[in-house]
Amino acid sequence: MVSIRPDEISAILKKQIEDYDKSVSVSNVGTVLTVGDGIARVYGLQQAMAGELIEFEDGTEGIALNLEDDNVGAVLMGEGYGIQEGSTVKATGKIAAVPVGEAMLGRVVNSLGRAIDGKGEIATSETRLIESMAPGIIQRKSVHEPMQTGITAIDAMIPVGRGQRELIIGDRQTGKTAIAIDTILNQADQDMICVYVAVGQKAASVANVVEVLRERGALDYTVIVAANASEPAALQYLAPYTGATIAEYFMYKGKATLVIYDDLSKQAAAYRQMSLLLRRPPGREAYPGDVFYCHSRLLERAAKLSDAMGKGSMTALPIIETQAGDVSAYIPTNVISITDGQIFLSSDLFNSGLRPAINVGISVSRVGGAAQTKAIKKIAGTLKLELAQFDELAAFSQFASDLDASTQQQLERGKRLRELLKQPQFSPLILAEQVAIVYAGVKGLIDDVPVDKVVDFSRELREYLKSNKAEFITEIQEKKVMSPEAEAILKDAITEVVSTMVASAA
């Protein structure tokens, strides 16, 4: 028989007592009552906060949104196939946060800031809360610096400033995303960080955008946040806030940032789905009562910061898709009232061959005028009015058989101005080129050029200036002002190109 040694037993007991962990961990735990359609009802979680992250037994994360008397309504940020009735749920005590930092540049991430581009994890230790307060009144400064889009029609007539919120609105397939991508491409030498948020889009469309940006070297200063159509509604709802959070990091570091939300109609639809499943009372068009706040708190985070705050800026270009041009629907009117102007794209203009298909008559920039460069502001002052008058006359002239000479001339000039503003995709123009093109049209220097040759004239003028009048481009790009000397150089160049074209046409 094995002899029992008391000293050995006492040594084991002493060691176990010494190793005993006295710390007590208290966790707020609940039980799943029902789960389905991306929503879980949880019993317990007495101390849960609104918007708190909760963790399910299978590792799925959720957000507590409805705090009711006897249960908590949570949205799932994942498929949640492993969640069953009776599963335990743990409150994390944290609000949703995403990783931020320089390492995010050039990456494609999901709504939680996790890499989905197959390039491994993002090497950053910094995080920011997804829901952050917008800068206050004292922390802001009025918009005064231009944000060049590279699209002549916008920079000349509907200018956007750094820190502005400018809505891009139009039916499907009217070139809304194309304007946003062109704007990103034009920031290559502007020292601006871009964030492109894709909400509820086809994965193939997002892959196409990534490829375009990579080919043209724009991915180096861009972060892409993607919540595709296949993702749960909660992730589609969160994506724009994630994009704003990533841009905010750079804004508070004193950098200029640009955020594109493509598009907020799909985010509103995802929020409506979540709210209806959580049994919140529906309002107009079945959207919940706080859908306005959902967008206003997002877009108010865009700002031009004061000197004391580091002079950073966040420019927001939200995109809204309309149905059959109806800008008076609920979500479009909401976002129009929040933003500082809108660029309206018309499917009729798009189908008639005018691209970008901007309807100048109802497009407006409420604060961008203060940020426009003097060179183009001086020249383009009458451009918007002339185009609006041309549209009216064009409609009237369909019914009038004989028109007087001045009306005929106005119609002819309007046609040429229209042609001048045509611009192919992925070919943003520098300021000097825009100034030259607008000057030629507004001053009537191309009235002798046939309408079908105006696009060729625009291209040839740009090439002529680059090769023969480089001093004009240098002066406009550096000084941003049109001096009498520069105007004389430009006039000579336009006359030269026009005479060459007219001679070759004859």
From Swiss-Prot:
Its EC number is 7.1.2.2. InterPro entries: ATP_synth_asu-like_sf (IPR023366), ATP_synth_asu_C (IPR000793), ATP_synth_asu_C_sf (IPR038376), ATP_synth_F1_a_nt-bd_dom (IPR033732), ATP_synth_F1_asu (IPR005294), ATPase_a/bsu_AS (IPR020003), ATPase_F1/V1/A1_a/bsu_N (IPR004100), ATPase_F1/V1/A1_a/bsu_N_sf (IPR036121). It is found in: Cellular thylakoid membrane. The record marks S363 as: Required for activity. The keyword Transport applies. Signal peptide: none annotated. CDD domains: ATP-synt_F1_alpha_C, ATP-synt_F1_alpha_N, F1-ATPase_alpha_CD. Keywords: ATP synthesis, ATP-binding, CF(1), Hydrogen ion transport, Ion transport, Membrane, Nucleotide-binding, Thylakoid, Translocase, Transport. GO terms for cellular component: plasma membrane-derived thylakoid membrane; proton-transporting ATP synthase complex. It comes from the Bacteria. GO terms for molecular function: ADP binding; ATP binding; proton-transporting ATP synthase activity, rotational mechanism. The keyword Transport applies. Produces ATP from ADP in the presence of a proton gradient across the membrane. The alpha chain is a regulatory subunit. Belongs to the ATPase alpha/beta chains family. This is ATP synthase subunit alpha. It comes from Synechococcus sp. (strain CC9605). The gene is atpA.
